[in-house]
């Protein structure tokens, strides 16, 4: 969960998000080193009178400023491509959930069950209980078993939406008439918050996403109760 004055990302709750955090640190280190090098060159150039200001040609300098950026781009591209393919992998999902965006709420359908679906609306501020988060709580949470591959099918009923869950490293556009898919594995139990991340109208800010990751036995009990109430 994000908190005031936070500078970094949320704590990772999935293997993909852990990889994204590592890549962020890797890229940030490269940017920091480049910035330090440029700053050093500027300072030394300005502060010394020994710099030759009339160089018209230097084969060595041209080789360095061509090869070095190419190597740096390769150092950034290789781990980036690895994570890109990792995010697209969906191997043998244990559970498939269809998330449908509406103006302005989400509906969820557990496609492995005959009749397990519900709408998820934001809880108004005046109805919140102590300890709940304003604009982030919903009347029905999407409950998933932890340490299990979960496939999410994302679409929309009316306009463009986007199903985003930062702690899981997931963001997938919901497009009317199109079925997109993504996946995640919750590596620990907890309640994780997200929001619609595509401007979709007047109440765009009021369609939160709440995912609760629980042990498999708790998920089975929850699904049994939901099927009885259906």
From Swiss-Prot:
Q: How does it assemble?
A: Component of the cytochrome c oxidase (complex IV, CIV), a multisubunit enzyme composed of 14 subunits. The complex is composed of a catalytic core of 3 subunits MT-CO1, MT-CO2 and MT-CO3, encoded in the mitochondrial DNA, and 11 supernumerary subunits COX4I, COX5A, COX5B, COX6A, COX6B, COX6C, COX7A, COX7B, COX7C, COX8 and NDUFA4, which are encoded in the nuclear genome.
InterPro entries, from UniProt?
Answer: CcO_II, CcO_II-like_C, CcO_II_C, Copper_CuA, Cupredoxin, Cyt_c_oxidase_su2, Cyt_c_oxidase_su2_TM_dom, Cyt_c_oxidase_su2_TM_sf
Protein name, entry field: Cytochrome c oxidase subunit 2
Binding-site residues, Mg(2+): 198
The annotation note on the cofactor reads: Binds a dinuclear copper A center per subunit.
Reactions accelerated catalytically: 4 Fe(II)-[cytochrome c] + O2 + 8 H(+)(in) = 4 Fe(III)-[cytochrome c] + 2 H2O + 4 H(+)(out)
User: Which Gene3D superfamilies does this UniProt record tie to the protein?
Assistant: 1.10.287.90, Cupredoxins - blue copper proteins (2.60.40.420)
Question: Is ATP-binding a UniProt keyword of this protein?
Answer: no
What does this protein need as cofactor? Cu cation
Residue ranges, Mitochondrial intermembrane compartment?
1-14, 88-230
Recall the GO molecular function terms of this protein's record: copper ion binding; cytochrome-c oxidase activity
Q: What EC number(s) is this enzyme filed under?
A: 7.1.1.9
Q: Which family does it belong to?
A: Belongs to the cytochrome c oxidase subunit 2 family.
* Enzyme class, UniProt record, top EC level: translocase
């Amino acid at each position: 969960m994000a908190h005031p004055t936070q500078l970094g990302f949320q704590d990772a709750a999935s293997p993909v998000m852990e990889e994204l955090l590592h890549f962020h640190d890797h890229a940030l280190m490269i940017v920091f080193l480049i910035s330090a090098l440029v700053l050093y060159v500027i300072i030394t150039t300005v502060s010394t009178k020994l710099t030759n200001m009339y160089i018209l040609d230097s084969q060595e300098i041209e080789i360095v400023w061509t090869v070095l950026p190419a190597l740096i781009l390769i150092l950034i591209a290789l781990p980036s491509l690895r994570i890109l393919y990792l995010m697209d992998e969906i191997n043998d999902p244990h559970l498939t959930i269809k998330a449908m965006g509406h103006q302005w709420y989400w509906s969820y359908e557990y496609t492995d069950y005959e009749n397990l679906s519900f709408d998820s609306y934001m809880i108004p501020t005046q109805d919140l209980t102590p300890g709940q988060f304003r604009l982030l709580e919903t009347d029905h949470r999407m409950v998933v078993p932890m340490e299990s591959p979960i496939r999410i099918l994302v679409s929309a009923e009316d306009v463009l939406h986007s199903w985003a869950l930062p702690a899981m490293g997931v963001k997938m556009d919901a497009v009317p008439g199109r079925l997109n898919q993504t996946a995640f594995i919750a590596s620990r139990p907890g309640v994780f918050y997200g929001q619609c991340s595509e401007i979709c109208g007047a109440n765009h800010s009021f369609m939160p996403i709440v995912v609760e990751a629980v042990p498999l036995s708790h998920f089975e009990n929850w699904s049994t109760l939901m099927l009885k109430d259906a």
